A protein has these predicted regions:
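Short acidic/glycine- and proline-prone juxtamembrane loop motifs at membrane-interface regions
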Residues: 131-140
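Membrane-interface alpha helices of multi-pass inner-membrane proteins
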Residues: 162-181, 187-192, 217, 298-307
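Specific aromatic-rich, kink-prone transmembrane helix
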Residues: 139-158, 165-173, 194-195, 322-326
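Membrane-lumen/periplasm interface segments of specific transmembrane helices
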Residues: 207-250, 257, 261
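Extracytoplasmic catalytic/substrate-binding loops of multi-pass membrane glycan-assembly enzymes
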Residues: 32-47, 52, 56-72, 81
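Perimembrane helix-loop-helix junctions
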Residues: 155, 186-216, 279-282, 331-334
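Transmembrane-helix signature of polytopic, membrane-embedded enzymes
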Residues: 101-124
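Loop-to-helix entry region of an early transmembrane alpha helix in multi-pass inner-membrane enzymes
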Residues: 62, 66, 79-99
Length: 418
């Protein structure tokens, strides 16, 4: 029995290691204390008003769809209106996004080794940095879940079984759009590209109709209660006093002047596609084309999203995991090597590649000396060669503490002056 268990545990871990990574990285925030962030009031405000039963666009105004606050408001109902409930809501969003990304790769028949490396990339690049709910993250998470249901729908041979997945895809893609217009629209566009491809080349016209009908039905169910409200004013489509963020010149300029990773990935993907196409049957391969559409769609989304939603500057880095999954899968196919045999090497490479995501937290355990006054000692290095005389800098977060007697701010640190 002991021998059996000894052999069983590594097998179970190997089979579900990607799920393990998703759960661990998503649950990390529950064990931490957080410094208060000024803009987090936006997450609180909308969720709290929904928690009170107020009606969006009638009792309070929003510059976006209220899909952003649905899950935080639910967690306010379950755990009470406190800041930690927002963190718990983001934990669920991260788990859903990670599992949906994993599910997309499984439905695309990506090998376990490549899938494990891609999931770890997703965890380090996108899950680890997002521990507060934020609309520029929530819309992408909803979109990834919607794309997963789309993968499920088209992998089911039975139309009746696929219909439920198509309805689920329509729901989450609409929620993505109804959370943030730009990111949500781009995620819907990726989904529509897959639906149109399957309809034209796979003759899946019935599924196309079910998806479009489901999307229209979901839209009616969400928008009908908003009739007679100020939804048209608050929904930003560039009308005064809003301004349109969709500038082709800005998008092209950002892409050509910066976007090094997006351009690098695009070059590798083009080379892989050309190589595969020369070997024949690439353009008629449904799996290859859908995988390519998803990957290019996410790269295109990231290229536009970084201009239309420019804060925070790293809100578009979800594309890394999709791109590396396609590139590693393509290299494994072209070179005929089993990525699963080199899984640990791939994981080590990803950990080194994305070491900046976690090293900045580990580095806090060993703070470096900083020169704050002239001294007689001859200690000059890259950490001490400049004297900080700025008296207007933000207060050191190391001095922040919890506010006693305020349960809503449990485990949330604030400046002592607060």
């Amino acid at each position: 029995m002991i021998i059996f268990r000894t052999k069983l545990l590594p097998m179970v871990f190997k089979r579900h290691a990607d799920t393990f990574f998703i759960l661990v990285f998503s649950l990390i925030p529950l064990a931490l204390h957080f410094p208060y962030r000024v803009n987090i009031f936006l997450s609180w405000e909308g969720a709290y008003r929904l928690y009170l039963g107020q009606h969006p666009y009638r009792d309070f105004g929003l510059p976006m769809g209220f899909g952003y606050w649905l899950l935080p408001a639910l967690f306010f109902k379950i755990f009470g209106p406190n800041m930690l409930s927002l963190v718990k809501a983001q934990v669920i969003l991260n788990i859903c996004g990670g599992l949906a990304f994993r599910g997309i790769l499984k439905r695309l028949d990506v090998s376990p080794g490549v899938r494990l490396a891609a999931v770890l990339t997703f965890c380090l690049s996108y899950i680890l940095i997002n521990f507060w709910p934020w609309y520029n993250n929530t819309d992408i998470i909803y979109g990834i879940v919607g794309l997963y249901f789309l993968m499920v729908a088209y992998s089911e041979r039975s139309l009746s079984r696929g219909a439920g997945a198509l309805a689920g895809s329509a729901l989450f893609l609409f929620l993505s759009f109804f959370t943030k217009q730009d990111g949500g629209f781009l995620m819907v566009a990726v989904g529509l590209a897959i639906v149109v491809y399957e309809a034209v080349f796979g003759r899946e016209w019935a599924r196309c109709g079910i998806f479009l009908g489901s999307f229209a039905l979901v839209a009616v169910l969400f928008l009908e209660p908003l009739r007679g409200t100020a939804f048209g004013y608050w929904f930003n489509h560039g009308q005064p006093p809003h301004t349109a963020r969709l500038s082709p010149r800005d998008i092209l300029g950002e892409f050509l002047e910066f976007s090094q990773w997006i351009k690098f990935y695009s070059l590798l993907i083009i080379l892989i596609v050309v190589w595969k196409a020369r070997r024949g049957s690439f353009w008629n391969n449904q799996r290859e084309m859908v995988f390519l559409l998803v990957t290019l769609g996410m790269l295109g989304t990231a290229a536009i999203f970084q201009v239309t939603s420019y804060t925070p500057p790293d809100n578009n880095i979800f594309f890394h995991a999709f791109a590396i999954a396609y590139i590693l899968d393509g290299l494994a196919s072209l070179m005929s090597w089993d990525a699963s045999r080199y899984a640990w090497l791939l994981l080590a490479g990803v950990l080194l590649w994305w070491s900046g995501s976690y090293f900045k937290y580990l580095n806090r355990l060993f703070p470096q000396p900083v020169a704050v006054a002239m001294g007689g000692e001859n200690v000059i290095n890259r950490h001490t060669y400049m004297i900080n005389t700025d008296t207007a800098h933000i207060e050191d977060e190391g001095t922040w503490t919890e506010v006693p007697g305020m349960p809503a701010f449990h485990k949330i640190k604030m400046p002592p002056s607060t």
